[in-house]
């Protein structure tokens, strides 16, 4: 992705090594102006008890779809090692369990890999913001994909005359094909200098903590196009070579290599109705239920033409080693919220055979370039990375789709659960929720019978004047999140106030699994769809519930505090 405040630095590089038959500028539906500021918010949500109980003690939602298996909450006290108290010196907008830098700018995550017994993640970081240009790769590690520890800058900007370090991908070269030794971590990244984007290689022999520059950079020189970035590299075992997908304006270019250093163009995939494509992905998966296999091509794209915002668009199809053929021209979308961008997915190399292809993990940057500079921020800027989610394939009406649920490791952050008996929410009145979260960072799961008419609304941080609403519209058949009434809405562009919806056309039971943190809400629906939103509510300790038209039978409701994770501790 092009980054905020990327400028011209360094000398012009030597010719690169990519071979490509054309050098025309691809059609560009949109040129992004990439602003810089953080998504930040203060969210303290506490509810009072008030609804009539009928059946006590249900610990989780009744409906359990294929992609969202039941999670039995931890009913005992949380482990001593977990803390649920926010540090006194934290900005109120600092997320409690989402990854942020200690200060300065954050955006695109880079696909994690497993090495040395840990997961390694990088994200784009600008320590010079707002007064200086360019991003570099900041390193974080985790044992569970949920609790992250910041390790420091791993690939520095402006050190080789080719500009700053933009998005790319790192792979573990298990055979040493690149010539840096078996097990070396090889990163292919975009560098931008004076507006020209090229691909460079850096390598690490200490599991990704430090990187050396390849002396043949750039390994891919720009063939004369404006947008030519975000290399996503995978190992194509069936064809015994490396494959790269590169974002090239309105198209995705495919390249192959035997050694990660010499790349040859082989084909492309063009879409002129999704704006500027960024942060591509390519991977194979298997539906564990039907056994169907598919390849998935994805990119961060602009869905405005279909009434959406930017997000992670994907296509299922086939890959023959050189060309991707989509099953359908229309893309699917992994998340229906406004703030799930620059997403990355990955599998677990410790799993083998077909088992490795049955599920992947994913996370994204929780922000949107339409208003990133308008969100309030103090200690750092750019927002946060999302919670890691598990994604699986699910066949619906003969078409394979990706479904999401929070990663299993999220449960390890939960504290003592509070649950409510089953109860009925009567129409018309706005009432306090039946149980209250103990902290501003919490997980809430609720399931209720689909009402005959009207809406069910859960208002987070409801002080009577401002709130963020998670709800279900029975007549439209959609779940929704709206922040049109939060504390930042009046000074935000229209894109921020737009209601975001996720279609839920069938089913008698509606299930929400909601992760709430300062600055964000992630809603996972019973069918495996999701809505991720940056929010800026007020500091009211109140959550209310309302049914606008018909009585609603709540089957289960529970809330657990989430541990506070300091990635800089």
Spans of features found by a protein language model:
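N-terminal Sec-pathway targeting helices
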Residues: 26-41, 52
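Terminal targeting segments of Actinobacterial cell-envelope proteins
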Residues: 1-32
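N-terminal compositionally biased, intrinsically disordered segments and leader/signal-like regions
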Residues: 3-4, 20, 26, 43, ...
């Amino acid at each position: 992705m092009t980054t905020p405040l990327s400028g011209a630095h360094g000398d012009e590089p030597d010719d690169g090594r990519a071979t490509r038959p054309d050098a025309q500028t691809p059609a560009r539906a949109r040129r992004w102006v990439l602003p810089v500021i953080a998504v930040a918010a203060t969210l303290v949500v506490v509810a009072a008890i008030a609804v009539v109980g009928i059946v006590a003690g249900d610990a989780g939602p009744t409906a359990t779809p294929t992609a969202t298996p039941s999670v039995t909450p931890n009913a005992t006290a949380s482990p001593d090692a977990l803390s649920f108290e926010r540090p006194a010196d934290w900005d109120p907008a600092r997320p409690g369990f989402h990854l942020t830098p200690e200060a300065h700018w954050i955006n695109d995550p880079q696909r994690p890999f497993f090495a040395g017994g840990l997961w390694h993640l990088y994200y784009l970081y600008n320590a010079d913001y707002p007064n200086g240009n360019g991003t570099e790769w900041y390193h974080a590690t985790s044992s569970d994909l949920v609790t992250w520890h910041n390790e420091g800058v791993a690939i520095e900007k402006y050190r080789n005359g080719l500009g700053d370090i933009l998005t790319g991908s790192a792979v573990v070269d298990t055979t040493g094909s690149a010539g840096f030794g078996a097990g070396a971590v090889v990163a292919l990244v975009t560098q931008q200098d004076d507006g020209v984007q090229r691909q460079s290689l850096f390598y690490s022999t200490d599991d990704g903590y430090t990187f050396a520059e390849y002396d043949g950079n750039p390994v891919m020189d720009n063939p004369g196009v404006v947008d030519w970035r975000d290399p996503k590299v995978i190992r194509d075992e069936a064809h015994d070579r490396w494959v790269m997908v590169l974002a090239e304006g309105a198209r995705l270019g495919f390249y192959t290599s035997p050694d990660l250093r010499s790349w040859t163009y082989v084909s492309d995939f063009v879409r002129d109705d999704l704006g500027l494509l960024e942060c591509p992905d390519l991977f194979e998966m298997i539906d564990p239920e039907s056994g169907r296999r598919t390849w998935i091509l994805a990119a961060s794209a602009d869905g405005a033409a279909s009434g959406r915002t930017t997000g992670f668009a994907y296509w299922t199809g086939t890959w023959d080693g050189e060309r991707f053929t989509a099953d359908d021209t229309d893309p699917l979308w992994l998340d229906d919220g406004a703030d799930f961008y620059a997403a990355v997915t990955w599998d677990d190399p410790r799993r083998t055979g077909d088992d490795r292809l049955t599920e992947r993990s994913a996370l994204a940057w929780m922000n949107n370039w339409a208003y990133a500079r308008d969100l309030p921020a103090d200690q750092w800027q750019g927002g946060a990375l999302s919670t890691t989610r598990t994604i699986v394939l699910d066949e619906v009406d003969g078409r394979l789709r990706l479904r999401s649920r929070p990663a299993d490791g999220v449960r390890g952050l939960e504290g003592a659960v509070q649950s409510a008996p089953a109860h009925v929410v009567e129409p018309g009145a706005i009432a306090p929720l039946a149980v209250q979260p103990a902290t501003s960072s919490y997980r809430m799961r609720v399931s209720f019978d689909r009402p005959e008419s009207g809406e069910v609304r859960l208002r987070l941080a409801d002080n009577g004047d401002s709130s963020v609403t998670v709800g279900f519209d029975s007549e439209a058949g959609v779940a929704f999140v709206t922040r049109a009434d939060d504390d930042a809405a009046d000074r935000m562009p229209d894109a921020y106030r737009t209601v975001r919806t996720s279609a839920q056309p069938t089913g008698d039971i509606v299930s929400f699994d909601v992760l709430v943190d300062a600055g964000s809400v992630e809603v996972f629906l019973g069918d495996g769809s999701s809505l991720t939103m940056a929010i800026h509510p007020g500091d009211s300790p109140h959550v209310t519930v309302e049914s606008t038209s018909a009585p609603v039978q709540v089957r289960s409701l529970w809330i657990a505090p989430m541990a506070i994770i300091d990635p800089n501790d």
